[in-house]
């Protein structure tokens, strides 16, 4: 995988959180409907599974497998079969499963990037990464929980806007950390 600095990663994640929060708060009704529909959106599921599968293959390509080098092709076939099999046979909550795998891959990128940075503020991102891993595992084994969580978050427009405001605040924090702390 190409290397990225913690500053750039923080700014990218911050900009994404900020943009999503601003869009969701300005188009709350439409965004709320999108959020509610996401868990059962097959097209989003196919895309997220594809992105996750390619990303995982890229990670595996760069790994030193030492004693298991002979099995590299088998691992690649297994990853492809798992991704394709998920799309064919696990269509129920496919978007949630794809998002869960992607959450864990993003968490790996965050932890790998923050590992050797000197600033204690890196722990903000590392904490988020560990929460993403826990969430990813939880949503993988019980994907209906994301549907329930989204239903709770969108049940009241005021609550939805508060959650969007929290996302905006977090995005600003990550942008500021990327600009001023993680240089």
What function would you assign to each model-found segment?
Residues 7-11, 42-48, 72-80, 160-164:
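Alpha-helical transmembrane segments of polytopic membrane proteins
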Residues 1-54:
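N-terminal topogenic module of multi-pass integral membrane proteins
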Residues 68-136, 147:
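Membrane-proximal helix-loop-helix units in multi-pass membrane proteins
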Residues 147-166:
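Interfacial loop-to-transmembrane junctions
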């Amino acid at each position: 995988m190409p290397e990225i600095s913690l500053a750039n990663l923080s700014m990218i994640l911050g900009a994404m959180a900020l943009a999503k929060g601003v869009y969701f708060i300005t188009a709350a009704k439409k965004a709320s409907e999108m959020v509610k529909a996401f868990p059962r959106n097959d097209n989003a599921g196919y895309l997220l599974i594809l992105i996750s599968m390619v990303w995982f293959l890229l990670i595996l390509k760069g790994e030193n497998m030492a004693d298991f080098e002979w099995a590299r092709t088998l691992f690649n076939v297994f990853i492809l079969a798992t991704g394709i099999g998920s799309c064919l046979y696990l269509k129920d909550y496919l978007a949630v499963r794809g998002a869960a795998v992607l959450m864990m891959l993003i968490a790996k990128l965050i932890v790998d990037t923050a590992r050797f940075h000197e600033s204690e503020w890196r722990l903000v991102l590392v904490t988020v990464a560990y929460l993403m891993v826990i969430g990813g595992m939880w949503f993988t084994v019980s994907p209906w929980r994301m549907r329930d969580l989204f239903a709770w978050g969108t049940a009241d427009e005021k609550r939805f806007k508060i959650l969007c405001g929290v996302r905006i605040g977090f995005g600003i924090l990550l942008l500021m950390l990327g600009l001023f702390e993680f240089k």
